[in-house]
From Swiss-Prot:
SUPFAM superfamilies: RNA-binding domain, RBD (SSF54928)
Annotated TM spans: none
Leader sequence residues: none
Organism for this UniProt entry: Xenopus laevis
Pfam families for the chain: RRM_1
GO biological process: mRNA splice site recognition; regulation of alternative mRNA splicing, via spliceosome
Name of protein: CUGBP Elav-like family member 1-A
Role summary: RNA-binding protein implicated in the regulation of several post-transcriptional events. May be involved in pre-mRNA alternative splicing, mRNA translation activation and stability. Mediates the rapid and sequence-specific cytoplasmic deadenylation of EDEN-containing maternal mRNAs following fertilization. Binds to AU-rich sequences (AREs) of jun mRNA. Binds to the embryonic deadenylation element (EDEN) motif localized in the 3'-UTR of maternal mRNAs. Binds to RNA containing several repeats of the consensus sequence 5'-UGU-3'.
Gene3D superfamilies referenced in this protein's UniProt entry, alphabetically: 3.30.70.330
Length: 489
């Protein structure tokens, strides 16, 4: 419709050279011109041809330049993925040529902040026109039509935009503004997507921490029966004296913290276990832990070895020691929690006289209790363990026992070893966490490994974190394959 209109000898400075694909090979410049001149005057059409043939044959694509940018965009909106030309199976593909990407709008568009609300578009144009031709100027306005104190200015070239930034950024403070004017390149779509993903990641991590709070057992109650059953199994086993070795250690830690703890605080873990059990309507050892006050009094007494005639009391004292070491919700400091790490290392020796099954059961139970301690005090617990585990676990590739090593992928690009450690630490004692880095680009490969010191923690992590959404992706968490398998994972 516009093909017969008068036009200058050259296209406008902001005109776009477009690439067009899915064109019949039999079409010449004449047919193409007839098609495109419906949208505006055409300056040039260049059909790509295969010069190896004689005569050269069309490759089914071309470049086209309109006199105006508007005509090119109208043609693209009407034809791209919309119209199928005769003899073709797919619609026309029309987009700016690669050479045009060097002059993309996002590379020439400026954000102007701290603009006086009394300014209009003409005032902004007058301020920035000395730096070059302005393609577009727009002030952001609210629903009431009032200026929001910021604007966008698009120049015809990037060099003009750079000159404006260099000369105008923080050069003056406009009327009614508290800070100097801000002039910078506007956020690109990629920048906006990155910010959005970062915000989503922060929200997801906050939700993860919130889900681990003592008062919210949603993410933990499904695991509670495992740990409570293990405690119950140990407490009711025939070899009750095997637990008595924990008593002196429990008493030592208990008396060391009496200034910050009381009987109610010592029962917090038991109450937590009982609450988790109640959420599942499952009877548990939590009731046994809270039903007797004698273990609590024993913990604050001297560390003398208990009599073999009081095996049941010794058992309860030992479980009480686990309570103490797992921590309380008030009056507890980082040094108190530090005892948990030492306790973990001494657990095996304290059970040296016990049977293998009892030792294994209590070891797994302790891992569960450690998780509940993280639930009760997520921020303090993480602070303590990050200072201890972080020294050796983050970045190392030390493996745990069979069934305790996890393979995690779909990690965010910006995640490092410490981030991975912090995310998986609430489920148990992490012996190593490693995000793999591409040696060529020094960027994350978006997968990594986490190893625990026991399989129960690994299963807890899988249950809670597999499918956990971060940004646009969902984590995939699975057990690392055995060394005997042919594949590493």
């Amino acid at each position: 419709m516009n093909g017969t209109m008068d036009h200058p000898d050259h296209p406008d400075p902001d005109s776009i050279k477009m690439f067009v694909g899915q064109v019949p090979r039999s079409w010449s410049e004449k047919e193409l011109r007839e098609l495109f001149e419906q949208y505006g005057a055409v300056y040039e059409i260049n059909v790509l041809r295969d010069r190896s043939q004689n005569p050269p044959q069309s490759k089914g694509c071309c470049f086209i330049t309109f006199y105006t940018r508007k005509a090119a965009l109208e043609a693209q909106n009407a034809l791209h993925n919309m119209k199928v030309l005769p003899g073709m199976h797919h619609p026309i593909q029309m987009k700016p040529a690669d050479s045009e990407k060097n002059n993309a709008v996002e590379d020439r568009k400026l954000f102007i902040g701290m603009v006086s609300k009394n300014c209009n578009e003409n005032d902004i144009r007058a301020m920035f026109s000395p730096f070059g031709q302005i393609e577009e100027c727009r002030i952001l306005r609210g629903p009431d039509g009032m200026s929001r104190g910021c604007a966008f200015v698009t120049f015809t070239t990037r060099s003009m935009a750079q000159m404006a930034i260099k000369s105008m950024h923080q050069a003056q403070t406009m009327e009614g503004c508290s800070s100097p004017i801000v002039v910078k390149f506007a956020d690109t779509q990629k920048d906006k997507e990155q910010k959005r993903m970062t915000q989503q990641l922060q929200q997801q991590m906050q939700q993860l921490n919130a889900a681990s709070m003592w008062g919210n057992l949603t993410g933990l109650n499904s695991l509670a029966p495992q740990y409570l059953a293990l405690l119950q199994q140990t407490a009711s086993s025939g070899n009750l004296n095997s637990l008595s070795g924990l008593h002196p250690m429990g008493a030592e830690y208990g008396t060391g913290m009496t200034s910050g703890l009381n009987a109610i605080q010592l029962q917090n873990l038991a109450a937590l276990a009982a609450a988790a059990s109640a959420a599942q309507n499952t009877p548990s050892a939590g009731a046994a832990l809270t039903s007797s006050s004698s273990p609590l009094s024993i913990l604050t007494s001297s560390g003398s070895s208990p009599s073999s005639n009081n095996s049941s009391i010794n058992t309860m004292a030992s479980l009480g020691a686990l309570q103490t070491l797992a921590g309380a919700t008030a009056g507890l400091n980082v040094n108190s929690l530090a005892g948990m790490a030492a306790f973990n290392g001494g657990l095996g020796s304290s059970l040296s006289n016990g049977t293998g099954s009892t030792m294994e059961a209590l070891s797994q139970a302790y891992s569960g209790i450690q998780q509940y301690a993280a639930a009760a005090l997520p921020s303090l617990y993480n602070q303590s363990l990050l200072s201890q585990q972080g020294l050796g676990a983050a970045g190392s590739q030390k493996e745990g026992p069979e069934g305790a090593n996890l393979f995690i992928y779909h990690l965010p690009q910006e995640f490092g070893d410490q981030d991975l450690l912090q995310m998986f630490m609430p489920f148990g004692n992490v012996v190593s966490s490693k995000v793999f880095i591409d040696k060529q680009t020094n960027l994350s490969k978006c997968f990594g490994f986490v190893s625990y010191d026991n399989p129960v923690s690994a299963q807890a992590a899988i249950q809670s974190m597999n499918g956990f959404q971060i940004g646009m992706k969902r984590l995939k968490v699975q057990l690392k394959r055995s060394k005997n398998d042919s594949k590493p994972y």
